[in-house]
Amino acid sequence: MFITRSRFTSYFRFHKLVVLAVLFIFPTAYAQQPLPPSGAYDASPYLGQVRNTYVYGDIWERPNLSKRDRSMITVAVNQALYATNELRLHMGRALDNGVTQTELSEIIAHVMWYSGFPTGVNAARVVAEVFSERGLPNIPSGASSRQPPADPELEFPDAYPQTPYLRDLLNQVVYAETWKRSELSPRDRSMITVAVGTALYASSEVRYHVGRALNNGVTQDEISEIITHVTFYSGFPTGVNASRIAAEVFEGRGLPLAGGRFPGAPYLGELIGGLVYGETWSREQLSTRDRSLATIAVTLAGYQSDQLRVHLRRGLDNGLTTQEIAELIAQVTLYSGFPTGVNGSRIFAEILRERGMPLPD
């Protein structure tokens, strides 16, 4: 179903009135549904529709994960992506959903090992502002300082012999210390690590931590739901990649697999068939050719090789010429870096050879 700007504006205003009315009558029951930030979707009303209908009207209401769990993984992913505005919003939402100050503090420290110190420093600054705005203590009462283990058990004693200091950090700090801290349970740590690995398209980390999550009490259905939830914050290519890997891990453990294209995250298939291709790709505001250009650019910049391959083929089918795609690769490379451009050029050359098409001049 397509909604014109005028119809959507009326719908959006009506939705806000309904939300305000329900909040007034049932403040506790509806406290979890946030109002859209003022003016946030003025320049992209369809994005606002997706936000209301799919993200908060559907995903956040699914029973497969608790609101607390969804808040934890959303904070973790937005930290990893350096999405400061969303991070601030979801830190407040996490506190409303039962995540404690101590847990928020610990999420930041945990995620930092997987997404880098700059993301941790940024998140620490943001959470301090959120605590201050809410009149909460600046230092969470349950947070503890470093307690290095005296005789750490090494999880990967033979890992990375070429970089022994990295091996020591991995074994002695990440696993023997951070993963053992009591501020978060092993289950919570596994959930946020699977979420961050999904968001960062870190395939090997997703593979390892899906297995570790199963060992730590995260169910198969919960892992599938984490992948689906994170998809809306880091993009569908990341969800497709994680779903494929999760399915392989489930199969390797003899766990039952759902049918369909995405057995690792079955609901993802419905969303891709409906929201992505059935609805968004069919909207008349952009041609399929232009949508292919945009999608190739994004998957190229994200080094998302599998999805880049899919959309390079789709771009050719949608009327893009080899010269246009070659030029697009060069253009995007200047903004995303030469490694992404070299990867894109290599994949495009493979596709052209498969199709018996000449390479661009």
Language model features by range: what are they?
Residues M1-R13:
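N-terminal secretory signal peptides that target proteins for export/translocation
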Residues L200, G302:
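Short, solvent-exposed interaction modules
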Residues A31-D69, L81-Y82, R88-N97, E103, ...:
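Acidic, glycine/proline-rich low-complexity segments that act as flexible tails and inter-domain linkers
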Residues R70-N78, L104-I108, R189-G197, I226-I227, ...:
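Short, structured motif recognition centered on aromatic/hydrophobic residues
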Residues L87-R88, I108:
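Glycine-/proline-rich flexible loop or hinge segments
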